[in-house]
Amino acid sequence: MSNNQILFERAQKTIPGGVNSPVRAFRSVGGTPRFVSRAQGPYFWDADGKQYIDYIGSWGPMIVGHVHPEVLSAVQNVLADGFSFGAPTEAEIEIAEEICKLVPSIEQVRMVSSGTEATMSALRLARGFTGRSRIVKFEGCYHGHADSLLVKAGSGLLTFGNPTSAGVPADIAKHTTVLEYNNVAALEEAFGAFGDEIAAVIVEPVAGNMNLVRGTPEFLNALRALCTKHGAVLIFDEVMCGFRVALGGAQQHYGITADLTCLGKVIGGGMPAAAFGGRRDIMAHLAPLGGVYQAGTLSGNPIAVAAGLKTLQLIQAPGFYDALTAQTKRLADGLAAEARAAGVPFAADSIGAMFGLYFAERVPTSFAEVTKSDTERFNRFFHLMLDEGVYFAPSAYEAGFVSSTHDDAVIDATLAAARRAFAALAA
């Protein structure tokens, strides 16, 4: 038995399914999960000492690569001062100022410890601000594992074939209306029917949890206009795409301003940190100023803030996003070219430093189109690439991520491995 197999068997005795987040279990692709022993730059090494090119980057946070020396130094510099205080620090102000500078729609921001906390808190705030209960979300968009959002969601739920979680009471789910992503007509119909009941619309402007699916400009502009017209709060869930698709996130890319924005992943630099923020008049309803309660023991943790602040400083380097976007596009275009040369039906897309791989004739634009992709062929491709030392997401329904450490040599090695994998698929 390999060390990975030994660890997986051991883990299953004390951890449900042997993992602390379902997609890590390899259930949809089969086989044994890779247990990571260490990581550096664009690589990680598993428990058997095998090196992999890493295209999940902890599901998005590692935009400057694993163990970036300046991020490491920033963390080391604060460790001796204390791990957690439960009281305000100057560093919290510094990261808040940085976030507000980079995302102009955010006038005030509140730090939390996870993306789920961010979206859950933003929805509570929107309901408190509007005095309404109904939430609108979209098929395949994943906004964390709060009850009201686990309805026709993406991510691990979609991976396991049941997009609505057990354990979500009908009395909670009834306040969530689910519409088709990128469907403007359905959106207009919903607002026409019950627009005065809608507290908020929450959306991934670039969805990454049903694979990569871009919101169309028409769809996102319609969202903005309808929310404004009906007094609903527009929430952009940029936990994944924030600081990934552009320095100012999807709002910069599309030129659309949200009322509230949820952030995570990159803002923690690999540490557990997230945030939600937006218009000052809405944020004023949060305790201790207003009646909407939200709190957290580890919110604004000094170690996480140090890693996140340094990461946010690094990504502002001139040309950072131009180079990162170009490398990501080179990967996606190169994979599509290799598949085409082998005669394998395949499509790829990228935006900023996110990419999607689809065993389908074209890039999907909705949840329904994503679910028509050839998952069996994806699973074979995943394992062929894994054998080659390339680690893509172990699910056909997750986006991939490129870091600034994925240089030409890394992309070249990936494409060479893909050439062999597609040839094997076509045989």
From Swiss-Prot:
Biological processes annotated in GO: protoporphyrinogen IX biosynthetic process
Main location: cytoplasm
EC number: 5.4.3.8
InterPro entries per UniProt: 4pyrrol_synth_GluAld_NH2Trfase, Aminotrans_3, Aminotrans_3_PPA_site, PyrdxlP-dep_Trfase, PyrdxlP-dep_Trfase_major, PyrdxlP-dep_Trfase_small
Keyword Iron attributed: no
Example GO molecular function: transaminase activity
GO cellular component annotations of the record: cytoplasm
Locations listed in the record: Cytoplasm
Pathway: Porphyrin-containing compound metabolism; protoporphyrin-IX biosynthesis; 5-aminolevulinate from L-glutamyl-tRNA(Glu): step 2/2
Root EC class: isomerase
Known partners and oligomeric status: Homodimer.
Record's protein name: Glutamate-1-semialdehyde 2,1-aminomutase
Organism, as annotated: Burkholderia ambifaria (strain ATCC BAA-244 / DSM 16087 / CCUG 44356 / LMG 19182 / AMMD)
